[in-house]
């Protein structure tokens, strides 16, 4: 199979390697269809920021089940799936409390081990979930980044009937805007320094947008105060 391999000092190459085999009964092999490039990948590519080299990055990806281990009976070849890249230890105090993202001994697909910039990958069954049959497979690669905004809404006890302000209309912000609208926000406001991104924010459901590079700090404070304080 082909994979994108990163060496040190920003060197990127396409390499041929053996298709990985399933070694444990709780594993599945995924034929990757779509894999996103995260902002966190950039220092790993250009600033020697990965844990080791050479490495295949990619932690936002979707694809189709290609093979399953003997202990997997709820997924079958051809099923569309997305990947959850976090690999907690499940035994440390934080994991036992359910705070898997705080695991002291976590592993991570596409960062601490080879990831989704390849044609195939073998992962644990618990690290993939089936996608709706009517979802375009490319959309599945957005599942991991969309959870960033959803996590914030979860910490805020939801956003239904609330005034939601998204600061930064990059990929994560634009996904959060769509989530806020879908979850019943009273209003959704986007703030950025890029007019192009703010236009995208409007197209994705933001009810009002502000370019903070064109406003003074007192003006921005006044806008935020009006948005946050009840009338």
Report each predicted region and the residues it spans:
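Glycine-rich beta-strand-centered segment in the early N-terminal region that forms part
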Residues: 20-35, 48-93, 132-134
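NAD(P)H dinucleotide-binding glycine-rich loop of Rossmann-like/cofactor-binding domains
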Residues: 89-167, 215
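N-terminal Rossmann-fold NAD(P) dinucleotide-binding loop
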Residues: 173-174
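Adenosine-nucleotide cofactor-binding segment
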Residues: 166-169, 181-231
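Cytochrome P450 core scaffold surrounding the K-helix E-X-X-R motif
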Residues: 40-45
């Amino acid at each position: 199979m082909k994979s994108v391999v990163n060496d040190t000092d920003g060197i990127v190459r396409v390499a041929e390697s053996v298709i990985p085999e399933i070694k444990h009964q709780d594993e599945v092999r995924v034929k990757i269809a779509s894999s996103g490039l995260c902002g966190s990948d950039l220092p790993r590519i250009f600033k020697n920021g990965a844990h080791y080299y050479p490495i295949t990055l990619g932690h936002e990806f979707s694809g189709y089940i290609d093979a399953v281990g003997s202990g997997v009976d709820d997924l079958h070849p051809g099923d569309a799936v997305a990947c959850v890249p976090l690999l907690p230890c499940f035994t440390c105090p934080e994991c036992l409390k359910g705070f898997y993202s705080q695991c002291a001994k976590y592993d991570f697909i596409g960062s601490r081990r080879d990831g989704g910039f390849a044609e195939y990958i073998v992962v644990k069954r618990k690290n993939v979930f089936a996608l709706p049959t009517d979802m375009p497979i490319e959309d599945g690669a957005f599942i991991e980044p969309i959870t960033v905004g959803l996590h914030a809404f979860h910490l805020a006890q939801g956003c239904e009937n609330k005034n939601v302000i998204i600061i930064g209309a990059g990929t994560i912000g634009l996904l959060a805007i769509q989530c806020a609208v879908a979850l019943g926000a009273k209003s959704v406001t986007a703030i950025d320094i890029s007019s192009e991104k703010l236009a995208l924010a409007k197209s994705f459901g933001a009810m009002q947008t502000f370019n903070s590079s064109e406003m003074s700090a007192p003006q921005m404070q006044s806008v935020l105060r009006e948005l946050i304080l009840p009338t």
